[in-house]
Amino acid sequence: MMKLTTRCGSAAVDGLNEALLAKAAEAKLLRTNRVRADTTVVPANVAYPTDSGLLATAVRRIGTTAKRIQAAGGARRTTLRDRSRAAGKRAHAIAAKLRSGAALGADQTRAAVLNRTGELAGLAEAAAREAERLLANARQAVRRAKAKAAELAARGEHDAAAGRRRGRLVRAVNDLAKLLTATRQIVAQTRQRVHGHTPDGASRRVSLHDGDARPIAKGRLGKPVEFGQKAQVVDNDDGIVLDHSVEQGNPPDAPQLAPAVKRVIKRAGRTPRSVTADRGYGEAKVDQQLTELGVKHVVIPRKGKPSQARRAKEHRKAFRRTIKWRTGAEGRISYLNRGYGWDRTRIDGLAGTRIWTGHGVLAHNLVKISALAA
């Protein structure tokens, strides 16, 4: 089922969502008098990333992937030293230093941790360097295997066992190539941190298998930083999700609202009377864009200190009543998290997250619309 889901891609599930909303609009079940928007983080399927943990895992996976290549008949005479034990020892030493930080003092503990982390980066670099040679030889083996298969096909023959072995070899070679790219990136950002520089969060790698996941600081208690993709949800009075989108990293909220409302207008065939969102969207440009789209009431608190006129507007009874209704967007996101898989994507990458969240929205809207139609 997972292979079928990823093969169809996000376009298929997007089409299903569009068809469902179109059917609801045709049956006059899609209310757009009031709509609200909010953003959330869809966590990637990754453990909490640390430089030492990522490096130790990279060293171990390089060794296991190399063994897969050699077991499939590639680069059998190329030697690759297994550094996983040495990497594990250094990772455990870092954990021990952090546990004994109170006894050693903060400065001494930090120096010891950075020293061990630098050693781990060196081990990962050495493992990647050796694996590059093995990868080059394995690619030659793949070319030879494909040439042999072509010769057999020209004679009208077929070796099923060799084909399966070749498939395993190709998959292992591709996995090692991706792993080495990720390892080099993690080594580079670890070197930055060891030298006192903080890696750029927009490009920082936090996983070996999910290259699109990014650190996102939302300022939540208990979860100040989450790792995954940022999603926006737009729903109405009935709780139907009228629009959703997933973006990489932590883009600003404000520029996402007007395009979402445009899509809602296209689906419903009419303009929402009132649009509300939290203070993260509070910019004069957003109000102007929504007004130009035909929205009569834009109910979004402004960032910073408001002027006296703006303060008076935000204290009106209708404004405050709509703002109270807006808080239900957080409940909608919580409902998606608890019941429809938004608490963690099980498909890697940005495209995978879009597929996963799209299926969640489809199931959610089917329940809501069927209840309205009953």
Give the ranges of each region predicted by the language model:
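Anion-binding and metal-coordination hotspots
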Residues: 2-374
